[in-house]
């Protein structure tokens, strides 16, 4: 009986994929690579130019951006590096 209960618990965890998170890069511009675990199902990379040169922002999700900002969204671990 205990074996059956344990089997059901394991099957439930595997089937529900509890706790899955996507790992996205979150370093800014040319900073050393850093990552964060995200509950969102996508990562983003925003690129734009200003008086300091080309700027890059990375993070979780897929935000809306203003005109003139290049946005790349993706759905695999560290895909926004």
Swiss-Prot record:
Gene3D superfamilies: CD59. SUPFAM superfamilies: Snake toxin-like. Disulfide bonds join 24-43, 38-60, 62-73, 74-79. InterPro entries: Snake_3FTx, Snake_toxin-like_sf, Snake_toxin_con_site, Toxin_cobra-type. PROSITE patterns: SNAKE_TOXIN. It comes from the Eukaryota. Expressed by the venom gland. Keywords: Acetylcholine receptor inhibiting toxin, Disulfide bond, Ion channel impairing toxin, Neurotoxin, Postsynaptic neurotoxin, Secreted, Signal, Toxin. One of its GO terms (cellular component) is extracellular region. It is found in: Secreted. It holds the Pfam family Toxin_cobra-type. The keyword Signal applies. Binds to muscle nicotinic acetylcholine receptor (nAChR) and inhibit acetylcholine from binding to the receptor, thereby impairing neuromuscular transmission. This is Short neurotoxin D.
